[in-house]
């Protein structure tokens, strides 16, 4: 059930939710730092050693051969293949609109200023292994990179107990245009992508979710390479009016609660009656879920509700929390969209469940968490590009404007800067 709190306590709620960020303890950071250093020095040998140690699999090589890749794909269910093809179309349709070109500005006296938009050359995608397998994450990470124009997109994922990869992951990688797959996970995979080994070339950026050791590794290699984010636990906030269907609201709250005992599920509503019905539905629906224990722990610790005086007040509180997923389960949701300032992704209306965005709708499901939607964005084509400016001044232009450059440089006491302009004005 959701614990009701009062509007006056919203600041405490916000701090409580933000405290769920992964605690990268000193012990974890030291362990991961040692793994990274080992991979930097010993490369493939270290990677294979850690695969044996952590995944209990002895491999001769990390790279997935084309034969193995194709063989795994053949094991996929036809209905899964159909669903993934449609999801890919939707994701591509949405992300293609994000692609932008550069520009050129021409001014008087032979001055040209421009900006080039260039794709990164190589990107590494981390895909978790273990019991869970997330082919949707492969599409969400790889397709924007390919649309951006990244030529080399590689994927790392831990091998299973048989030393291979899950068929659904293999198919998703092929569908998304991944160029190579390597059977390696954990901090050692992040280190290999960041620094390179005999088998794995270094990349420019690493994206994708992982456990606390993967998160620590991403944090430690940031600066050597770029990363997407250090993601916290999943979160959903539902704004619902009195006409919202309690069954729908409960189902959507549970869709995030089942992720993790630290996942948060928040309901902001104008109806005390709806809150009561939602709590009844949560008990009913959670009782039959395979991950019942995780759901119960999540709701006990991070399932909260506030009854507000208006939808505007609900959205105002939501803006302070800045949730990863925001659902506006209200009448005329488009009219209220402009009031939303901070949210990773917004789901409008009674029928737009958050799962649509997770798998199929086309918007990206790699979203800012832990309140970072106040200043950061979902993964997109922009995540895989860099912008470079260029400038051209003619002889006429430097003679006309060089004195101003010299004046500013001299005021900053950087005489060599001033001289660089001065010598061209002779």
What is the predicted function of each stretch?
Residues 1-121:
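N-terminal Rossmann-like NAD(P)+-binding subdomain of aldehyde/semialdehyde dehydrogenases
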Residues 2-8, 180-185, 305-310:
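Short acidic-hydrophobic, aromatic-tinged amphipathic segments that line or gate anion-handling sites
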Residues 106-171:
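Conserved small-residue-rich beta-alpha loop and adjacent elements
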Residues 151-161, 265-271, 278:
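Short internal beta-strands
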Residues 177-255, 259-264:
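Conserved NAD(P)+-binding/catalytic subdomain of aldehyde/semialdehyde dehydrogenases
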Residues 259, 267-343:
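A glycine- and small/hydrophobic-rich beta-loop-beta segment
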Residues 320-426:
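C-terminal core of ALDH-fold dehydrogenases
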